[in-house]
Amino acid sequence: MACKSKDIFSISEKKSKIHFITQITELIIKSSNLMKTLGFETSKIEGIVTIEEENPKLFFEENFDFFNTNFNDLEKDEIKIFIENEDNQLSLGTIFFAKPMNRYLHFIEDRNFFDIIENSSLTAHFQPIIDMQTNKIFAYEALTRGVLANGELMYPDVLFAKSARNDMN
């Protein structure tokens, strides 16, 4: 299977419009009301609630708990986010690149994982496999670890779980 991780997901830090997109009317109303609760003016067109934000990445970092508290997992998967700025205009063609809200929240939650990917800080350890009958090495297995900024290791179970949930496998 081909690797899908050529394009590393990131959240813009430029002044942008953040579009919350869904075909479920109740989620449009809920999204609009919750953005107003946060103090944002919203604009709505059918299926899209829009706010303007100076730094979308900081917006998701600051409101991480708010989104997790006020939206359940099904809602976070249903609501798609599109960040529009001068580099990325919303159109009929680009709207298909909108990602689920969960993807943005995972990006914030899994910051250590993305640091490992961005910095290419993976290490491999080779471990011998011993034949119990002959007590000789008959093969080796490679164990991949991510190296965190503080030097600690992210073990394969965590590394691969974060890779899968961020669609990087």
Briefly describe each language-model feature range:
Residues F97-N169:
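Bacterial c-di-GMP phosphodiesterase EAL domain
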Residues C3-N102:
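N-terminal accessory interaction module
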